[in-house]
Amino acid sequence: MCQRRYVDDILKRFAMDECKAVVSPVDMSTRLVPSDAATKVNAPFREAVGALMHLMTATRPDIAYAVGYVSRFMENPQEEHWVAVKRIFRYLQGTKTHGICFKPGNKIDFRGYSDADWAGDLADRKSASGYTFLLMSAPVN
């Protein structure tokens, strides 16, 4: 299952259809922090994050961490938060054909995995956790 057309549509909607691809959805050398600045970024931040959430829940669990990370800044997005969203778009540019694959003949099994990062957020020491379930070796959440 793949949503290449949807990826093309959202890249075009946010003027990222000709962007250069990157190999990961998050730049781990950049730490985003909340801002109390009165001005917000002049970009469709919430609309973009919503479009990414739809894609994430349907066929792209590989962007779940990145989308969850940028969604923390929905209340008062700043330029650096918008840059992080655009990085996810750049990752999608290079992985348009990625999706979930159910192969015929796979044994019907169901597995679950989880992980946690305790107090890993440098701004407020909040913890993060995540999980995924595999059905016939394909992620379903």
Feature locations, PLM:
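Long, low-complexity, charge-biased intrinsically disordered regions
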Residues: M1-N141
